[in-house]
């Protein structure tokens, strides 16, 4: 198991590709903290699946990715519960589809807060620990689609 002894924090990981990242990292032995929203039972099932894949602990944070203080607390909780964050995958995102000339500014701001804001705040929170250890990986994901 390539990542045994490492801890990964993945935002936007209670379903979809984020859950896929979590499973892949757990299968390589990483302890994983997932984050997102959804059905509590499904999230708990995913958390248990991650533990069975890795043999390491898995945890869940319901931090709101638009709130910097919750993002900082999520990163601190991950370090406290699972060990310092070695791998951060900034995967949280939302989408709203409209032609640019019809795109509401409030929707644009919400998209940017989640995608860029959460990546900035999570990265800022974990980098000091990575520097202290002399090891860390940060992966920023995104997707786009067009009409």
Language model features: what each stretch is:
Residues 99-100, 104-112:
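Substrate-binding pocket helix/loop in short-chain dehydrogenase/reductase
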Residues 123-124:
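A short, exposed helix-loop element centered on a Lys and neighboring polar residues
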Residues 40, 61-74, 105:
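The beta1-alpha1 cofactor-binding region of Rossmann-like NAD(H)/NADP(H)-dependent oxidoreductases
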Residues 7, 14-16:
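Conserved glycine-rich cofactor-binding loop
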Residues 139-147:
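Catalytic loop of short-chain dehydrogenase/reductase
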Residues 28-45:
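Conserved glycine-rich Rossmann-like NAD(P)H-binding loop of the short-chain dehydrogenase/reductase
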């Amino acid at each position: 198991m390539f990542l045994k002894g490492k801890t990964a924090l993945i935002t936007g990981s209670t379903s979809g590709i984020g859950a896929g990242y979590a499973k892949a990292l757990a299968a390589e032995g990483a302890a994983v903290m997932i984050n997102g929203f959804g059905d509590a039972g499904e999230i708990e099932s995913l958390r248990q699946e991650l533990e069975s894949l890795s043999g390491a602990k898995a945890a869940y944070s319901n931090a709101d990715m638009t709130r910097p203080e919750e993002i900082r607390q999520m990163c601190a909780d991950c370090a406290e519960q699972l060990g310092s964050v070695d791998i951060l995958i900034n995967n949280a995102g939302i989408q709203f589809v409209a032609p640019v000339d019809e795109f509401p500014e409030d929707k644009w701001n919400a998209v940017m807060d989640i995608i860029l804001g959460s990546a900035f705040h999570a990265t800022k929170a974990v980098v000091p620990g990575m520097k202290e250890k002399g090891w860390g990986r940060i992966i920023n994901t995104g997707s786009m689609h067009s009409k």
